[in-house]
Amino acid sequence: RAFCDEHLDPVRIDREADIPREVIDGLGRLGVLGMTAPRELGGRGFSQMAYGRILEEIGSRCSSTAIFVNAHHSIGMRAWLLFGIEAQTRRWLPDFVAGRKLAAFALTEPEAGSDAANVQTQAVPAADGSHYVLTGQKRYITNGSIADVLTVMARTPVPGRSETAITAFLVTPDMPGFRVVEPRMEKLGIRGTATARLAFEQMPVPSENVLGPLGKGLKVALTVLDFGRTTFGACCTGAAKACLPLAVEH
């Protein structure tokens, strides 16, 4: 509460459509960006209930900051916590927990939103199996233009069958073919969040960056989204609690 009261300026964040880096760094130092991560990885080991209560507090002061934290932690980093192999978690999780790096979750497309099974982005395996080539677009990706690593859903061929299945990939912005089409889509509210449109143009992704089992990306997506939607509700509850006394006073 003290940090939020001292450092969060929701009017400035909304006006400038940006959350200052010093706020993000401060949240990282407090442990807010890795609340449910295991202690051995630098997290706090909080329960979902405790995490939700903190998001309520942040949401009561600045919705943009609450949504930023939720996107980074609840759906971005959460994918690693649930489905990452040890090499992946050891490589990235400590930086995410501390806020040195940021995470995003790239599912939504022009033709796929709540209908997660309708993802059209394609991932074609190389002949030698060393990498996949991703081609497609994503939109409305919270933290999409500021994330250091994104969990991207794409369709991969099912071996021995003439069909595809969704697979999750870990993607970094420095990969050739990664393009930010629109870094901050204009919105009426939560303007401080970096809601982006992205494009993957023949982008090679190493095979070791597959997250979870091959062809099981839909399970990854739905499992992570279940957690994120619950904690998003906590953000909204905090905002509603803050609005009630203001409405009564008015």
Where are these predicted regions, by residue range?
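A structural signal for short hydrophobic beta-strand segments in well-ordered beta-sheet cores
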Residues: 121-124
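Short Pro/Gly-enriched beta-strand edge/turn motifs at strand-loop
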Residues: 101-107, 178-183
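Short acidic, glycine/serine/threonine-rich loops at helix termini
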Residues: 47-49, 80-81, 115-119, 144-147, ...
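Short, solvent-exposed loop/turn segments at the edges of secondary structure
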Residues: 70, 74-75, 100, 116-118, ...
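A short core secondary-structure module
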Residues: 130-131, 135-180
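Short Gly/Pro-enriched turn/cap motifs at secondary-structure boundaries
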Residues: 111-114, 140-143, 159-160, 187-194
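Amphipathic, small/basic residue-rich leader segments at the start of a protein or domain
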Residues: 1-71, 78, 84-102, 114
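Glycine-rich beta->alpha junctions and the first turn(s) of the following alpha-helix
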Residues: 180-250
